[in-house]
A protein has these predicted regions:
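C-terminal non-catalytic accessory extensions
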Residues: 354-439
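Early extracytoplasmic/lumenal segment of secretory-pathway proteins
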Residues: 24-89
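A ligand-binding cleft/hinge motif common to bilobed small-molecule-binding domains
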Residues: 85-89, 216, 221-239
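Mature extracytoplasmic/periplasmic domains
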Residues: 258, 263-266, 271-325
Length: 439
């Protein structure tokens, strides 16, 4: 009898020891804000006391580089971010691992016409996201500004100095927003609209969080953001509102198992939790305010909360993640050289163009109109044409490893040329607009 008791006890101890050996830390690499990650961390750890979630916060571009640089066995366990093209990059380089058992069968196959999950099963939609504009209602009232409805509204003269955006090279969600406009309007027309809006910008921030924070506290009037920034501000009680323009897209924010991670089995448990009914319900927390992947009849959604399927039906852009990924480096680099690093000159040109436009509306002048059109063309035309971004040889230059001395020299030369040309164009545009206003 004693031997049986001992044997049972020994087995229990061994089982316990085995459980302790399996229990450990799951490292989650993410660009998401603390309000979201901490909510999931606490809820999951409460259900799984033997597992600790470690959050490693980096922007999307830095996250990709981080995973690529680490050897197998030392990588984070999970990648969790909004940018679908980032997951395409990791999948193509065999840095993701399939985890089909983590999916929730209640989730739809598509959002609108966009697949929720990777067809190869390497990453999965965990939430949904659209892109639009948030604004501070008190700020707009104080400055007598109407709430914007479409991207084009932000290019109007009355919005000069009232708009904020983060740099797409530093924010994956902003890159998606910029790419959505470019895909919706077309390359050339899209850049014209972007540059007109950016001429009205008060700031281009380093991190995406700075834009909603600035709108929430009244520093900026309007922010170009991913939807959850605007919705989180609204449902947390700030005097803000949010709208999806017609030229938007709804795409999944994804979660994936990183190949060569340290704790695959327990990482899968966390992934499954984020897509479970309990995990999806967390998205309605006012500080999170994201769109779930599960149908609303399986959840308790707040009154008047946006329904992603309805937003997707109204959205005019069928987002092409492959196209976005192919020209990612070109778009982000161009934006920095034409906008981020030349904002002061672009603002000056835009201010002069607005002034000349007002003067010529009050007092029409053919020569002035001609000069103003020249100014607009100089200020609001992309330095790289659509033919270039369809050229694989041109795109390949930007895909190469920048640590290579020759590659770095080539790219730096291109970027310096763009920066110099942008400055020259903006300064010439300002002078032409001033001439137009003086006639």
């Amino acid at each position: 009898m004693r031997s049986k008791i001992w044997a049972s006890t020994a087995l229990a101890v061994l089982a316990g020891a085995s459980g302790l050996a399996q229990a450990g830390t799951v490292t989650v690499l993410t660009s998401f804000p603390k309000e979201l990650t901490s909510a999931y961390q606490k809820a999951f750890e409460a259900k799984n006391p033997g597992i600790k979630i470690e959050i490693l916060n980096k922007n999307t571009t830095a996250s990709i580089a981080y995973i690529k640089e680490l050897p197998a066995g030392q990588r984070p366990d999970i990648m969790w971010a909004s940018a679908p093209d980032a997951f395409e990059v990791l999948a193509r380089q065999q840095l993701l691992q399939s985890a089909p058992d983590t999916k929730n069968p209640q989730a739809p196959a598509k959002i609108g016409n966009y697949p929720l999950n990777d067809p190869q099963g390497l990453y999965y939609g965990q939430a949904l996201a659209g892109y639009g504009m948030m604004w501070n209602t008190r700020y707009l009232q104080a400055h007598k500004l109407a709430a914007p409805k479409e991207w084009a509204d932000l290019a109007r003269p009355e919005y000069f100095g009232h708009v904020a955006i983060s740099s797409p090279s530093r924010s994956g969600t902003t890159q998606l927003t910029v790419e959505t406009i470019l895909q919706g309007e077309g390359w050339d027309k899209g850049w014209t609209q972007l540059l007109q809006i950016m001429g009205n910008a008060a700031a281009v921030t380093d991190r995406s969080f700075a834009v909603p924070d600035g709108v929430n506290n009244g520093q900026y009037g309007v922010g170009i953001v991913i939807d959850f920034f605007g919705l989180a501000g609204k449902y947390s009680g700030f005097p803000v509102d949010f709208a999806y323009p017609s030229m938007t897209a709804v795409v999944p924010a994804n979660i994936a198992l990183v190949a060569g991670g340290k704790n695959t089995d327990e990482a899968k448990k966390f992934m499954a939790f984020t897509m479970s009914t309990e995990g999806q319900q967390l998205l309605f927390d006012p500080k999170i305010s994201r769109l779930p992947i599960l149908p609303y009849n399986t959840l308790k959604a707040p009154a008047n909360y946006p329904n992603p399927q309805e937003v997707a039906k109204r959205a005019k852009v069928q987002f092409d993640a492959d196209l976005s990924e192919a020209r990612y480096q070109v778009v982000t680099s161009m934006f920095d050289q034409m906008v981020t690093f030349r904002l002061k000159e672009l603002q000056a040109a835009t201010k002069a163009i607005h002034a000349a436009d007002k003067k010529l509306r009050d007092k029409p002048n053919a020569k002035g109109t001609e000069l103003l059109n020249q100014a607009r063309s100089l200020a609001y035309t992309s330095l790289v044409g659509e033919a270039n971004v369809k050229d694989n040889e041109f795109l390949e230059v930007f895909r190469k490893n920048r640590r290579d001395v020759a590659v770095s020299k080539q790219l730096t030369g291109l970027e310096e040329m763009w920066s110099s040309k942008a400055r020259e164009n903006y300064e010439r545009a300002a002078k032409l607009a001033e001439q137009a206003a003086s006639l």
